[in-house]
């Protein structure tokens, strides 16, 4: 089960990275892409699980 979580985590990171590159510079903190924010929220929930 843990392996699935790790795989999912890595996939999400890859998706977020590609979305950031498509949107332009990752330094734009004033505007957050909703899809990107959703990805970060999911990652946070995964991190909080023991």
Swiss-Prot record:
One of its GO terms (cellular component) is extracellular region. Keywords: Secreted, Signal. Expressed in venom sac and, to a lesser extent, in venom gland. Not expressed in brain. It is found in: Secreted. Residues 1-26 form the signal peptide. Monomer. Amphipathic peptide which probably adopts an alpha-helical structure. When injected in subesophageal ganglia of cockroach P.americana, a natural host for larvae of A.compressa, dampens the escape response for about 1 hour which may contribute to early stages of hypokinesia. Has no antimicrobial activity against E.coli DH5alpha or B.thuringiensis. Is not cytotoxic in vitro. This is Ampulexin 1. It comes from Ampulex compressa (Emerald cockroach wasp).
């Amino acid at each position: 089960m843990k392996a699935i979580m790790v795989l999912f985590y890595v996939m999400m990171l890859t998706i977020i990275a590609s979305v950031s590159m498509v949107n332009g510079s990752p330094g734009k903190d004033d505007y957050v892409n909703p899809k990107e924010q959703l990805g970060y929220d999911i990652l946070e929930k995964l991190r909080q699980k023991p």
